[in-house]
């Protein structure tokens, strides 16, 4: 009698997955394209913030706003609108038309990219739905992300409007953090759905590994929220030393909680805002490192490789954050720190989704080599 050894469940030679349906490859490529576009949105949005360009367009015109000023008269009208803003009167008085155009193009480009993302989402979505290429779970997930994307556009305008109020020279930090976190949540949702459409089945990781893997994207999203508060309040410019904060490892309570009511300290007290972002970064790194050790012991192979990848990225992101702080947030470092946070979130989300496992199809239908970001972690993911 000849014995055969079953292939490991986390290898590419596993049985086809239940998600291996017609059009799977096209749907997956589309989801990853959307993820790339969202990262580009975050990058352009970060540059718009860091260059102080976010308040240069004072109206929200979802359709007609796609057309920029086309002649000198159009530019004069837009410039006059900007000169009525508090930001111009308080910070940018005397800026010339050429300087205004630089600000305008950043904000216009950010909004244009948002419209492009909407088109790239809804047109293929309608086609895939009509062709029957979207399973029920995937369809519901995409509908949810579509609604969240529409809400994100509204959040973006509410954020801009907050910066146009009397006495304001920038958008409200709380609204900026919400805008950034919502974009990050959309990105995580796209990557989660894409990773679940792999062609081949995958056995779930042990339950303890799954639990911590699922926790990591949540922690990263919280840290992105805290980073949004730092960015919106410019708290990163307050203490530019590390590991101390101008000689203090932990600032005294009277510095951290001097606002009334108490809850306002978590948004308006710049010392506490920066301290929270630092402290939570340490927590994320410690959890990622501990999880990598856990995965190596309990799930050697692909899951362990992914966990070590998450740990390495979180360490690199913390190092980049420290450099950004010490250099007093130059544009390149602040932008790199924001975009690299998206890389950490993508890797953590892929790891969490694949740790859940991908069920096998009831009957094999032929397999294709998976594509997508999860393949970057190495064979067997």
UniProtKB/Swiss-Prot annotation:
It is an enzyme of class 1 (oxidoreductase). Its main location: membrane. Heme binds at residues 277, 337. GO terms for cellular component: plasma membrane. InterPro entries: COX15/CtaA_fam, HemeA_Synthase_type2. It is found in: Cell membrane. Pathway: Porphyrin-containing compound metabolism; heme A biosynthesis; heme A from heme O: step 1/1. It is a multi-pass membrane protein. It comes from the Bacteria. Its cofactor is heme b. The chain crosses the membrane at residues 25-45, 112-132, 138-158, 176-196, 212-232, 279-299, 307-327, 329-349. Keywords: Cell membrane, Heme biosynthesis, Iron, Membrane, Metal-binding, Oxidoreductase, Transmembrane, Transmembrane helix. It catalyses: Fe(II)-heme o + 2 A + H2O = Fe(II)-heme a + 2 AH2. Its EC number is 1.17.99.9. GO terms for biological process: heme A biosynthetic process. Catalyzes the conversion of heme O to heme A by two successive hydroxylations of the methyl group at C8. The first hydroxylation forms heme I, the second hydroxylation results in an unstable dihydroxymethyl group, which spontaneously dehydrates, resulting in the formyl group of heme A. Belongs to the COX15/CtaA family. Type 2 subfamily. Interacts with CtaB. This is Heme A synthase. It comes from Methylorubrum populi (strain ATCC BAA-705 / NCIMB 13946 / BJ001) (Methylobacterium populi).
